[in-house]
Swiss-Prot record:
The gene is rpsI. It holds the Pfam family Ribosomal_S9. It comes from the Bacteria. PROSITE patterns: RIBOSOMAL_S9 (PS00360). Residues 142-151 have a biased composition (Basic and acidic residues). This is Small ribosomal subunit protein uS9. One of its GO terms (cellular component) is cytoplasm. GO terms for molecular function: RNA binding; structural constituent of ribosome.
Length: 166
């Protein structure tokens, strides 16, 4: 900044002009459009099938920490990765938050669905204006489907043993 003022004060000095040019050519770091600051992390819970996920959302750069692993390390399947990032992509906040999650129970698909619900709920607490977009996309609806219980007298939930008339 001092070089720029010297160049303005003394236009005959060629060294000051090149210094001013160097200052103006310095790259400007991209600042996110909206900066989020919370008193404490946003905490939500998502559930699907037998999976339960506790999500912590903090302002950051878009990193995922799932049981101490990265998103790619925990969910190698690209379909699950897309499913999880969908709420962030919908509201265009992929690089605005870091997500820390504790996942337990169920399998990969159930955990991915539970994580998606937890992230969507956390995004609403961070920015209530995003609720209509997330609701329209169906990210706020808890999937009620679960495994039906096995009944006695049957082999599975609905499969009956073979019936013989005689």
């Amino acid at each position: 900044m001092t070089e720029t003022t010297e160049a303005l004060e003394n236009p005959d000095n060629p060294d000051a002009e090149t210094a001013a040019a160097e200052v103006t050519e310095a790259p400007v770091e991209a600042v996110p459009a909206e900066s989020y600051v919370f008193e404490r992390p946003i905490q939500t819970v998502g559930r699907r099938k037998e999976a339960v996920v506790r999500v912590r959302l903090v302002p950051g750069t878009g990193k995922f920490n799932l049981n101490g692993r990265t998103l790619e390390g925990y969910f190698p399947n690209k379909v699950h990765q897309q499913l999880i990032k969908a709420p962030l992509v919908t509201v265009d906040r992929v690089d605005s938050f870091d997500i820390y999650a504790h996942l337990h129970g169920g399998g990969p698909s159930g955990q991915a669905g539970a994580l998606r619900l937890g992230i969507a709920r956390a995004l609403i607490l961070a920015s209530p204006d995003d609720r209509p977009a997330l609701k329209k996309a169906g990210f706020l609806t808890r999937d009620p489907r679960a495994t039906e219980r096995k009944k006695y007298g049957l082999k599975k939930a609905r499969k009956a043993p073979q019936y013989s008339k005689r």
